Amino acid sequence: MINPQRPDFENTPVSPQRPEYRYRPAGETPAPLVSIVTPYYNTGAIFHETARSVLQQSFQHWEWLIANDGSTVPEALEVLDHYRSLDPRIRVIDLPRNMGTSAAKNWAIREARTDLIVLLDSDDLLEPTTLEKWFWFLLSYPEWYFVQGWSVAFGANNYLWHRGFCSGREILQENVVDYASMLRREVFEKTGGFNEDMRTGLEDWDLWCKLANAGFWGQTIPEYFKWYRTRENHSEKWEAWQPKRLAEFREVLKERYPRLYEGYFPEIDPVESAENEPIPEEIPCENALAKDRKRLLLLIPWMVTGGADKFNIELVKYLTGQGWDVSVVTTKPSENEWAYEYGHYTGDIFSLPNFLRLRDYPRFLRYFIQSRRFDAVMITNCELGYLLLPFIRAQFPDLPVLDFNHAEAEDWKSGGYPRLTLTFQHYLDTIGVSSLHLKDWLVERGADARKIETCYVNVDTDLFAPSPENRRRVRAGMGLAEDLPVILYAARIDIEKQPRVFARVIQRVAASHDRFHVLVAGDGPDLPWLRSFVQENGLEERVSLLGAVPRPRMVELMQASDILFLPSLREGIALVLFEAMASGMCVVGADVGGQKELVTPECGYLVCRSDDPEEEVERYAAVLEDLLANPERIATMGRAGRERVVENFRLEDMGRRMCEILDHTIQVHHRRHPSFYSVDGGWSAAAMAMETIRLQLELIEGWRYRVELENALQAAQAQTAAFPAHFTPVETLRIRQLVYHLFRKSFFPYYNRMGLSGSDRILRIKERVKKVFDL
């Protein structure tokens, strides 16, 4: 999996650097459900890489039709002969003569035995989960006729390509659609497929325009699936790729498909999730995969920067190193900026919102669990995972299930994810927690103490360790003196980490101490506010706002800093405290959650929170002022913290402990008396779960519209002279009406739903809008 921020174009899907899941069918060769079509003309040895990327697909219900378009080079024919008898799913079709790539594709498509056609060139590569996600996308979205994803260009030219079917009408001016894709067979049958008169390239551009002209179109999944091999001069292979010929061919397209260039383009509206929508129960296939290692399914909300995800990544790393296969499934819409971090250790990663409608989540999970035959399922911070527990238990009564929680959240769902643990503990074999504090919290509220197992998240003490050399280098690069006290605030900049408290504390300390510097490493919704605060209060010389930083840089920042300051609103035990102490930093944090299980008075300060913000600011400021006045104490506490973490909280101890918990979960489950869950009841629970999530998503979207609207109202109220003096009253009224109706169109579908709650604040918005726009 490629890191879009720092792409490694050598780490292709067939690179030995990639983690190996060893996908292959269990038992007999499965019946094909997709047909891969590949034209082959003297490709040669590079074809072995393409073949490897096909053979290692996670979806094994395929057939591969390789159309030999009259190859003549002996070496190329020898390569092709290797695949004639390698696998019964591979069929080499020998054309009577060289007929051109369009004819070769059409020939293979006619020979295909399935309703789904995958187009793949003989020198390109596919990510291992490509076919599986494309197949399920077209199953979940019957209104779309084809699908693809983003592409990685490698070879002579390296770049990332994000355009495709999502670009819509841009296809009329430029061939923005990558060739590799999955299409419904019917589009070829109804349009005739590729133009066989085109033998010099661009036949795929013509195909996309032909399909659009016939009313067919597709969608782009926001993931990298296809690796496109580039050459120094593409026109050496295809004459039509020369700039002049491209311009000429655009004129040809205008003549062939005039209605496209006169304004027509297929508009396909995705079917949105409906109220109380029936949940499909049928799964299309088993896709039973061979298994020779233990397997864990990890259900998480997303893959984003944060302590919980760092723990998940380290767990996946350790388990795969111990011989486990780990599959990761995420359930919330997200850009998943840390997906590549998980991808270092497993390629079996599925972000359900990227390729499935909400209603298809339950049957996909049923299919997925059957396909992989997991030894255990682990749920962590995943609300949908909890809501689907009755369904999972009903479908798989012999499957051990555990969860893992880091912290309670009293102001969200009466306790956060641990509250869901309490609600669904009957379905859990083991309850995992990251602190004794959280264990006590659960037991006090009715959890079965016998089920609870504790594992601290711990830290890599070799990676996070003092480095005088890095300290000097980083400080020199930032213009900071070697003996200058440096305070680090490393966190997501949002309400849970209290950036407003942090900022006011620094402002207070700066008034009495002029010799220290602050580094802020992190991003989040409150970063713009923090930036404004720093500027408005003249703290630019004292505070460096670094934004989100990659993990290697975070290691260096900790090595260059002296004090970690994190005034959290709530925590379990913040992972960044483990990292800071391992790096030799003194820590100043909040006395919340289980943090005193890690931070002792010898290592740092934990400050009691206060309902009075001013008092809380005073408490933190007093601690920091005292430390800055006693630099030797900072160093002493840093050394003590390092010693404590090395002795008690090493990362390998976490890995071993989690393996113990997993083994215990499996053993406990199989020692239990059989439990019987109603399959019908499980499906009913799944329907209720999906309706709950659907309503949540709609309300969240409506709330965002409300916030945007109120921000716009405030801006409109502040700009009383928004209209030029020369505007007539009629012109001004028309503009006001236009803006009002734009707001109404975007917001009021959600207003109507949210108004049912009876909230006076929401119900007043309509009148406020009219008042602001003087209507």
Predicted regions, residues:
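Conserved donor NDP-sugar-binding/catalytic core segment of glycosyltransferases
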Residues: T129-L160
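Boundary detector for helix-to-coil junctions that initiate low-complexity/charged tails
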Residues: M1, G263, R671-L775
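N-proximal low-complexity "stem/linker" segments adjacent to membrane-targeting elements
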Residues: I2-R52, C285-L289
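Short alpha-helical donor nucleotide-sugar binding micro-motif in glycosyltransferases
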Residues: A548-V549, E556-S561
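A conserved mid-protein helix/loop that constitutes part of the nucleotide-sugar donor-binding site
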Residues: A45, D309-E314, P485-R508, V518, ...
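Aromatic "clamp/platform" in nucleotide-sugar-dependent glycosyltransferases that forms part
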Residues: L569
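Acidic donor-binding loop at a coil-to-helix junction in glycosyltransferase catalytic cores
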Residues: T200-L207
